Amino acid sequence: MRRKLLFLGCNYDQIPYLESIDKQNWKIVGADLNQNAPGRHLCDKFHSVGYDDLAGLIEVGVREKFTKDDMVFTAAAQFAQKGAAHFASNFKISFPSEESIDLCLDKTKYYDWFSKNGVPIPKTWNIKDIDELKKCLKLSKSEFFYLKSDFSKNPHYVYRFNSLKVPWEGFFWGRDRYLREFYVLQEEFQGVSLRINVYSDRFNVFDFLTGSKTNIHHKEIISLGVIDTLRDFISQQKMQDWLIKFDIILNDDSYVVLDIGM
């Protein structure tokens, strides 16, 4: 009997992953809110349920008789990893914990973790409203700042501004999937913006602005212990089998970590 694999998100971007998994003799159970999802034809079974419908995903698992010997996978939006982790936990499937996924999605959580575990970050405040923003800006002598919502994914609610010309009317203060509770206010850190992909015992560095792979910063990255620090985070979250992306800013003698991608 073929092992089952719950595949979350069956849009066009996910089709190459579906095709690859289909060649490995899995019984693919697809899940997508769109009943006419483009990848539906590659699934052995299909359920019209969104990756953020946690109860609905569990119902699918029960109906399809998932067990700990089966799998769950998603190549959809990062938010889909929450659904995958919740599903895996319910059926005792090997997968990073829901707590670890929540940590990687919520800036307030991972900046707090970084701060407590010696991972360098810019000067940071959690902001709930415009009054708190005004108060924190007065505490800093920095010229430039970034204001980012707790679940922001660029360009959603990411603002860069000069402290002498704050765009007060331009900030969104409602609440939605990208801003759930806090904004994160950070002093701008000067340096080169890089993305580091860490996987297994390897890593690759990319220029954040151009997306081009680069090796010119390896010496500084190694000497500052950046990779060891990032691998320690990955290990503690039990994500050693994943490719994890980190956005950092690097200068001659220091660095800060800004973001995590799964």
Regions found by a protein language model. Give the residues of each.
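Short amphipathic alpha-helical segments and helix-helix/interface helices
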Residues: 15-19, 85, 111, 134-137, ...
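Active-site flanking residues adjacent to catalytic metal/cofactor-binding acidic residues
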Residues: 8, 31, 147, 186, ...
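Phosphate-binding site of ATP-dependent enzymes
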Residues: 166-256, 262
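A conserved helix-loop-beta module that forms one wall/lid of the active-site cleft
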Residues: 89-166
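ATP-binding N-terminal substructure of ATP-dependent carboxylate-amine bond-forming enzymes
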Residues: 1-99
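Hydrophobic anchor at the start of a short beta-strand
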Residues: 28-29, 121-122, 183
